[in-house]
A protein has these predicted regions:
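Conserved beta-strand in the GNAT
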Residues: 41, 46-64
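A short beta-loop-alpha structural element at the N-terminal edge
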Residues: 1-10
Length: 133
């Protein structure tokens, strides 16, 4: 999904999760990597409930699920969609920056930690990678 269409659906979710819940500064939540990225959005009864993006360089990011839909498979479905898209376009590896509370989730999907924990937007993160077939 292009950013032009995805923006209307993904922006409210990202604002709720990152800006309101996690106190990420609003001015850094949207960036110049949104337009060239592939966006995946999950729906329930035509309402957008989760989102994520795949950057041209193979990084997955901006994974955000509305609170009431967490731990119900929405994040896994979005992640699978993005991984499948990376495989279809021929990526050999994908990477992401996981917030520490989400490292176990990404491990279950084949991602491995690399390097040390670092801080981004005031939140501890762990770089992770996964090889693709």
């Amino acid at each position: 999904m292009s950013w032009e269409r995805a923006r209307q659906l993904a922006s409210p979710i990202r604002f709720q999760v990152f800006v309101r819940e996690q106190r990420v500064p609003a001015e850094i939540e949207l960036d110049d990597m949104d337009a060239p990225s592939l966006h995946a959005i999950a729906f329930e009864n035509e309402k957008a409930i989760g989102t994520g993006r795949l950057l041209p360089d193979g990084h997955i990011g901006r994974m955000a699920i509305l609170k009431e839909w967490r731990r119900r498979g929405v994040g896994a479905a979005i992640l699978k969609t993005l991984i499948d898209a990376a495989e279809r376009r021929g990526d050999r590896e994908i990477a992401l920056s996981a917030q520490l509370h989400a490292v176990a989730f990404y491990r279950t999907h084949g991602f491995k930690p690399v390097g040390d924990v670092y801080e981004e937007a005031g939140i501890p993160h762990q770089a992770m990678v996964r090889a693709l077939a």
